[in-house]
């Protein structure tokens, strides 16, 4: 195929990894986003999903020249929505181009008319001057227009607009502007709703139309720390998971709790072959109805599957699952992959990795950040570390269950990062509860406090949901209180191991311990509120 010259503003088909070609537009990347080394790449914004990614030039094809070919090859719903978005974009651009041409011809007509009037006026002026030198009133045609409001005749004429097609083709790097547009027209023609494709060296940007320039550039920066860890971007499951190509590997899943149930459901929806096991077998029934197979023991699941995921409550449960009778270790053979998604301490995950690898297995830790709702929605954040080959083999699984994933390097790094995240979340929840109770005892409206918080810098879905739980007295578990307390305890121990103070986490931990003493362990973490009112 002959080389095609592509430039900023061109519409293209972009091929990313194992995913189908997707319609997009070549755009200028933010200044802080470094270009990948090696082969020539262009920065592409994809339609429909509004993902952004660096794509190798050889993986790009002109949109119009290959449109029929691509539409015949791909029939997914998300794909068709993306094509519709391109056509809508072109339709609007064509309308703007037509408006410009119409206004251009009107302007020429007005200029010609004005010129004729000017010449007539000149003749009249000269004639008048030759017959008399006395001052005369100017004719109505010669009267100067007032500055500001245009004459009535121009009222209904659309204002000239630059050609969108030409703007897209000719826009230079210096003229291409971030941040995202704020008007409805801009969002309609060049939407910056942000998701992400799985791309080495870039982070996921959360979908937030009002996101600031600083937030965009900060999140797009390549995250490559001194430890050599690299963040890896994954596709938003709401964006293109309708077109995920599921791996042909057999998937096993151990543990069908709050998080595991949502994960397995999404794996099945996206066409993966899944075998499940749970300590209480009844929990498997629903997934068997959805097409899953059932394993009698963890060892059986591991021995019959290529990649086995596990998501259990704590370090003890994680060890028992691997080392106990009919456990994972008994089913491990050379080449078998084991992915532990539990939130545990670095020492536990290192021990599990060692025993798995000693049997010829391959190990990846991949704890998840999120709650039951995010698990059900396929919007988890996955933190992975260990065998990078396993991480890549799990790509379609991670796309099904999460909105983004990060590969953080060697075993233990994901456990550390997960504990730090949950330490921050748990401490924040305790502070929310403390503020709500303080408002109550000082005679302030808790609802008004929430309304004010929702209008400020702390506004978030997490804040609103947890405060609503408190206001309604509804503590149905979305994230068990006993588990956030466990994570706080492990985070404090992590701080102790490196002689780092964690006084805020320690104080929050004591409040959660009091809530547990009040029989709140199996309620949502927001039930920590009750520790302040008893």
Swiss-Prot record:
Residues 190-193 are annotated as: Interaction with histone H3. NAD(+) binds at residues 252-266, 343, 486. GO terms for cellular component: chromosome; nucleus. Residues 93-122, 138-157 have a biased composition (Basic and acidic residues). It is found in: Nucleus; Chromosome. Residues 93-168 are annotated as: Disordered. Residues 8-66 form the PWWP domain. One of its GO terms (molecular function) is NAD binding. Keywords: Chromosome, DNA-binding, NAD, Nucleus. It comes from the Eukaryota. The keyword Ribonucleoprotein does not apply. The keyword NAD applies. Pfam families: NAD_binding_11 (PF14833), NAD_binding_2 (PF03446), PWWP (PF00855). InterPro entries: 6-PGluconate_DH-like_C_sf, 6PGD_dom2, 6PGDH_NADP-bd, GLYR1_PWWP, HIBADH-like_NADP-bd, HIBADH-related_NP60_sf, NAD(P)-bd_dom_sf, PWWP_dom. Residues 242-534 are annotated as: Dehydrogenase domain. Residues 144-156 bind DNA. Homotetramere. Binds to mononucleosomes. Belongs to the HIBADH-related family. NP60 subfamily. Cytokine-like nuclear factor with chromatin gene reader activity involved in chromatin modification and regulation of gene expression. Acts as a nucleosome-destabilizing factor that is recruited to genes during transcriptional activation. Recognizes and binds histone H3 without a preference for specific epigenetic markers and also binds DNA. Interacts with KDM1B and promotes its histone demethylase activity by facilitating the capture of H3 tails, they form a multifunctional enzyme complex that modifies transcribed chromatin and facilitates Pol II transcription through nucleosomes. The A.T hook DNA-binding domain is required for the interaction with MAPK14. The PWWP domain is a H3 reader and strongly binds DNA. This is Cytokine-like nuclear factor N-PAC.
